[in-house]
């Protein structure tokens, strides 16, 4: 439906006529306020277990009086009574309109239409109502409000999706998330959980002594990851700038400045593909702590995730999943998690001991056992061949939480080499579960001369391949390292993917209010 198409729909026209009729009665269908309300959740918490009395007690005003607002999502008329369900945030409550008791705010006493007929004929599903009335329990034990006064707070001009069919079209669900939220209890719960997860992360990080900061989204030089940036122009300075692809570099500069534990939760932008686990705009947490290495960071990460799982799951560390291609799975997030080097994981889960194979043999294995195009690894160095084998043969099998450690040096220039002296591998780990990468972490490189050398090597590769994702050298960052950055460990977690894991979501689009979508033809006109 185009932006204007709904204006000619029969339902819209009928509701618009009702809107005019309501206005003609002297009722403002869009009032300015409705103060003094309680939430449905608060009312249920306070009164659901009390003895309140029946509808007769409510009619005699002997039960507690309450005031709520919300969207009418169900309505049925039964003789002199009418029943409705009011949705407020993620909670619903039944209300009862009575022919002899209920009134309509603003309806003139001499109006030709009675209050109950106004409620039945002029109100529609989707309207937002203010309700004042008295609580009681029905014969079936349902907490209900006997309505004394109903106030129309907003006349909805477009009908709700069918109550039983809901929104089956995923395209519409993602584009018109407001309809999805109104229609689905499950969707609302997912986004309430998302909000709570972010709040819990902050609580955990603050309790661990980390300070939250904010750093620029617009940057003169992008860095901290291998990704293609969004490019824009800062008109005031007549300069090209980039939307950040990572939070890392700015946070390390703050570490140099003397803040020993620092974190940021913020938006990151990568001008790359869209799939089940990737969106060009996403939310990350990155954190850096002085005087720790990647072993300590593994403990931080697994304890953080265990804390979140327990907080959302009544103290249990076990979650059950239904959307995995391997079928239903039960996963325990209790720390400590499995720790395994990348090479060992390829041997264990991919049945390939990379130490026994030359580079050309690794290429043959990739050709025989994966669907990767040959040009993607034909000239790749050994470290990237090992990484490709891991990605193709191992990732999907990491259902239980794993920390995969000791990655090839070709995967990042920002990490310290193994302290064992093997310069081909670095103290990096990635955390996986449900076949998804959850976390990326390093023992951070703080030797400025070694850092410059590694970044210059990347620049040489970029000169040979202009389409590569290697970023330009940030001289300010190198200057900051020369000032002295303490030994540190750092991690980054994609919060959207974390929410997927904690809510059993099948796609990243299910945990983003408004995911990136292709522009509609009507939007191009």
Swiss-Prot record:
Binding site for Mg(2+) 2: 437
Gene3D superfamilies documented for this protein: Bira Bifunctional Protein, Domain 2, Nucleic acid-binding proteins
Domain of life of the source: Bacteria
Cofactor: Mg(2+)
Listed EC numbers: 6.1.1.6
Chief site of localization: cytoplasm
Presence of the UniProt keyword Transport in the record: no
CDD domains for the chain: LysRS_N (cd04322)
InterPro entries: Aa-tRNA-synt_II, aa-tRNA-synth_II, aa-tRNA-synth_II/BPL/LPL, Lys-tRNA-ligase_II, Lys-tRNA-ligase_II_N, Lys-tRNA-synth_II_C, NA-bd_OB-fold, NA-bd_OB_tRNA
GO biological process, one term: lysyl-tRNA aminoacylation
GO cellular component: cytosol
Positions with a binding annotation for Mg(2+) 1: 430, 437
Family membership noted in the UniProt record: Belongs to the class-II aminoacyl-tRNA synthetase family.
Listed name of the protein: Lysine--tRNA ligase
Organism: Chlamydia caviae (strain ATCC VR-813 / DSM 19441 / 03DC25 / GPIC)
Gene: lysS
């Amino acid at each position: 439906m185009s932006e204007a198409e709904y204006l000619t729909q029969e339902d819209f026209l009928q509701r618009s006529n009702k809107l005019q009729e309501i206005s003609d009665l002297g009722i403002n269908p869009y009032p300015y306020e409705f103060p003094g309300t309680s939430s449905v959740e608060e009312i249920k918490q306070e009164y659901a277990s009390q003895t309140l009395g029946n509808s007769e007690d409510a009619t005699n005003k002997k039960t507690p009086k309450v005031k709520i607002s919300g969207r009418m999502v169900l309505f049925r008329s039964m003789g002199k009574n009418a029943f409705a369900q009011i949705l407020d945030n993620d909670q619903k409550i039944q209300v009862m309109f009575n022919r002899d008791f209920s009134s309509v705010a603003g309806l003139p006493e001499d109006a030709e239409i009675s209050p109950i007929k106004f409620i039945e004929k002029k109100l529609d599903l989707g309207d937002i109502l203010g309700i004042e009335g008295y609580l009681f329990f029905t014969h079936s034990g349902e907490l209900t409000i006997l309505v004394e006064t109903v106030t129309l707070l907003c006349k909805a001009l477009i009908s709700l999706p069918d109550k039983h069919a809901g929104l089956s079209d995923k395209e519409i669900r993602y584009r018109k998330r407001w309809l999805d939220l109104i229609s689905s209890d499950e969707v609302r719960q997912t986004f309430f959980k998302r909000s709570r997860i972010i709040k819990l992360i902050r609580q955990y990080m603050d309790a661990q002594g980390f300070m939250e900061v904010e750093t620029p989204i617009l940057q003169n030089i992008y860095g901290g990851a291998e990704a293609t940036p969004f490019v824009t122009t800062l008109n005031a300075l007549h300069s090209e700038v980039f939307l950040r692809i990572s939070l890392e570099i700015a946070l390390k500069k703050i570490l140099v400045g003397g803040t020993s534990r620092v974190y940021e939760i913020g938006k990151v932008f990568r001008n790359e593909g869209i799939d089940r686990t990737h969106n060009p705009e996403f939310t990350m947490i990155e954190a850096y702590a002085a005087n720790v290495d990647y072993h300590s960071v593994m403990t931080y990460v697994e304890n953080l995730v265990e804390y979140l799982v327990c907080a959302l799951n009544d103290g249990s560390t076990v979650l059950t999943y239904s959307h995995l291609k391997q079928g239903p799975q039960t996963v325990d997030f209790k720390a400590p998690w499995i720790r395994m080097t990348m090479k060992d994981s390829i041997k264990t889960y991919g049945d390939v001991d990379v130490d026994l194979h030359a580079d050309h043999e690794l290429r043959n294995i990739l050709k025989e056992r994966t669907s990767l195009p040959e040009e993607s690894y034909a000239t790749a160095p050994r470290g990237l061949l090992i990484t490709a084998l891991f990605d193709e043969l191992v990732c999907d099998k990491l259902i239980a939480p794993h920390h995969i450690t000791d990655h090839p040096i070709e995967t990042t220039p920002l990490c310290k080499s193994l302290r064992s002296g093997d310069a081909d591998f670095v103290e990096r780990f990635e955390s996986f579960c449900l076949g998804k990468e959850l976390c990326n972490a390093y023992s951070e490189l703080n030797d400025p001369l070694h850092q410059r050398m590694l970044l210059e090597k990347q620049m040489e590769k970029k000169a040979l391949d202009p389409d590569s994702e290697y970023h330009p050298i940030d001289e300010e960052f190198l200057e900051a390292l020369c000032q002295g950055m303490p030994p540190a460990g750092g991690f980054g977690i994609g919060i959207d993917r974390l929410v997927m894991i904690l809510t059993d979501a099948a796609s990243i689009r299910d945990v983003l209010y408004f995911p990136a979508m292709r522009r509609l033809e009507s939007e191009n006109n």
